[in-house]
Amino acid sequence: MHTDIIIGDQFAANNNYWVMQSPELDYRHELMGRLHKIEPADVELEVLAAAAAAANNNNNTSSNNNHSSNSSSNNSNGSQTPNGNNNSSLATGGHQHHQFHHHLHHHHSHQHHHQHHHLHQHHSHSLQSGESGASEAWPHLPAPSYASDVPHAQQQQLQPAGSPNSNSNGAYGCAPLYDGAPYEVALGYGGAVVASTGGATSSDKEYLYETKNKEALYADPLDDPYQRPVLWDDITTSIQNIDPENALMLSSSGSSNNNGSSNSSSNTGESATSQLPQVKMEAIDESLLETFSTPLLSPLEIKTEKQQRQQQHQHQQQQQQQQQQQQQHQQQHQQQYQQQHYQQHYQQQHLYQHHPSLALPGLPPAVDVVELQLQQQHQQQQHLQHNNSSSSSPKLATPGDNSGNTSSYQQQYASQLVSGSGGGYLNGSSSNSYGYSWHSSQSFHTKYQIHPPSAAASATASATATPTAQLGAQQQQQQQQQQQLQQLCPPAAPSTPSTSSSSISSSSASSASRHMFVPPLTPPSSDPGSPGSSMVAAAAAAAAQRRTTPPPPYQQGHVMGLINPPPTLQLLGGAATGSNNSCTTTLTTLTPASAIQQQQQQPQQQQVPQQQPPPTPRSSGGGRRGRHSHHQPGTAAHIASLMSVRTVRYNRRNNPELEKRRIHHCDFVGCSKVYTKSSHLKAHQRIHTGEKPYTCQWPECEWRFARSDELTRHYRKHTGAKPFKCIVCERSFARSDHLALHMKRHLPKNK
């Protein structure tokens, strides 16, 4: 026994295995079956010489990869019409019931072409590469013979229900090499045994080498190495009940292909009808297709479905990306306007706090604040309504949300007027501000105290504030929080160019741009009853922190006065969007719980005010002269006041957010240091190891350091550089801690 392994277009001699491949269909699997090695003891072979009656006898067996030889199957198939199923197109026109193409080549050629033409018929037939037919050496075969001429596309769509052996484009045949007349291996379409083509009825043993391929119409998994579908008997019986026309085909295929025992008389009684086409064209209809587990699809339909799914998926992704871009654009737009308004508002606040004489001469300061804010509300509401009407994203703010922001914004200034008329506009201390009523407790604020407005002004202010102050108990709670906010950050008053000189405005503008740093207002690190001690303790750290990063270049504020969103959204350092919760979340940042949440954003928030100088027309004239105005003796008081505001924050030792991020532990025995960055841990471990990789490159200096900042500090001894300057006096220092100690001299003493 000798067979050939066919892989692609190449032959490999082997006597055990043969390989089938069908790469053109996505839902087909690569099949591999074991060919039964026929021994003389298993099957009695009767080889006849070439005779006139039996010149082309087909020897077909039903071993079927199950290691069972059917000794007497299909013995009486020759009694019917010769040339019934195999080589002649005259008996059955078109051979639509065939599936496999058996190409038996001459032993001198072994050619595998992509286009063959049948010698006896007029149909064309294409053989794809990778599916070349197996050919044996037939010394007496004059010309290649073909078992079927149906095109590939037609055969792919004509696969029947009961065919477990349908490999529509397979051109495979593994025929034994006999010394007698040539034998042709013909595989039946539905797995049925094919009658012989010889003219005489002989008792020759017929051997059928078939393959067990997974049918495309069945989605059941295979339960054994020989590719038998799960519950095959149940499926065939159910289909026989539904479609009795194909019952013959199903019974023959089930008996001769899928049963492991030897079926000696399965096809002898059906020899009269085995010549008929196994599957009729009208049998494949909708009623038959409904019984299958998977629909019958051609490869073209599968490809088009995949393309449609891919196009739909891409279209959905594009829509999602467009929506995200629109949302990001709107958020950036709102944040820009909030930052711009914050610059202008803080400048006005600083001017009005330290220079009350800059207000309008005829009106009290509180009334000016209300009128200015009403104008800003009107502009802001119009602009936000325009933005929301033009935006298509449903997640952005609506005009109703903006009206809620403006109403709470009006309540803020209404509450200021109520508290101001009661007991001093800025000097009325509140019990809810952590004990830090700075403007009433510090003695140096006497020259900047703001007197309460007159009776007429307070009446006008109360009349202005009454429509907005009657909105419910929840808004009264917001007013209390806003009062706390305004004690730490007083509102701004307008200053016009007609009433302010260039020197005063330039000095105030420069001081505002230099000292406008307002960090998130959080509970202080010391006892709430001792504001002076916490002020002194944090002044050094405040000055050092301001000096750690160089100030960025000043920005141009040409779009400053266009839109004015509420400044409360940015006063506390939160980048809020125009939603319903924007006012409530930012106005409640004075509570300890929310202050803890603000600590994670401190590094970014501390740099925001430095990038927001207030360029206005009244400060453009004397900006350069105003840089030196902080050397005046009167400005030391509001330097200390600004430092006192900056002290309300956590330090590095009691910040719970930093404790969560400290994940790098020192592994040395007895050391409990933990760091947030691995680079800090490496620098610390050099203390234990004694490593000092940073060497001073100054001539005749051999100092070495474990950290780069220590080397930088050491270089200043050689160069004499003193980059840390006092903002009050003209002294400079080479180290930031020395400047922090010096700043304590400028702080007022608490009595």
Swiss-Prot record:
Gene3D superfamilies: Classic Zinc Finger (3.30.160.60). Residues 153-167, 400-410 have a biased composition (Polar residues). It is found in: Nucleus. GO terms for molecular function: DNA-binding transcription factor activity; DNA-binding transcription factor activity, RNA polymerase II-specific; RNA polymerase II cis-regulatory region sequence-specific DNA binding; sequence-specific DNA binding; zinc ion binding. GO terms for biological process: negative regulation of microtubule depolymerization; negative regulation of transcription by RNA polymerase II; nervous system development; positive regulation of dendrite extension; positive regulation of dendrite morphogenesis; positive regulation of transcription by RNA polymerase II; regulation of transcription by RNA polymerase II. One of its GO terms (cellular component) is nucleus. A zinc finger (C2H2-type) spans 664-688, 694-718, 724-746. Keywords: Metal-binding, Neurogenesis, Nucleus, Repeat, Transcription, Transcription regulation, Zinc, Zinc-finger. Its main location: nucleus. Residues 57-89, 251-267, 309-351, 374-393, 458-513, 527-548, 594-610 have a biased composition (Low complexity). Highly enriched in the peripheral nervous system but is absent from the central nervous system. Expressed in neurons with more than one dendrite including da neurons, bd neurons and the dmd1 neuron but undetectable in neurons with single dendrites such as external sensory organ neurons and chodonotal neurons. Coiled coil: none annotated. Residues 57-167, 248-275, 304-351, 374-410, 458-578, 594-639 are annotated as: Disordered. It comes from the Eukaryota. Residues 95-125 have a biased composition (Basic residues). Disruption phenotype: Severely reduced growth of microtubule-based dendritic branches and elevated levels of microtubule-severing protein spas. Gradual conversion of multipolar neurons into the bipolar or unipolar morphology. It holds the Pfam family zf-C2H2. Belongs to the krueppel C2H2-type zinc-finger protein family. Transcriptional regulator which promotes dendrite growth by suppressing, either directly or indirectly, the expression of the microtubule-severing protein spas. Determines multipolar neuron morphology in postmitotic neurons by positively regulating the expression of genes involved in nuclear positioning including several dynein genes and the nuclear migration protein nudC. This is Dendritic arbor reduction protein 1. It comes from Drosophila melanogaster (Fruit fly). The lineage of its organism: Eukaryota, Metazoa, Ecdysozoa, Arthropoda, Hexapoda.
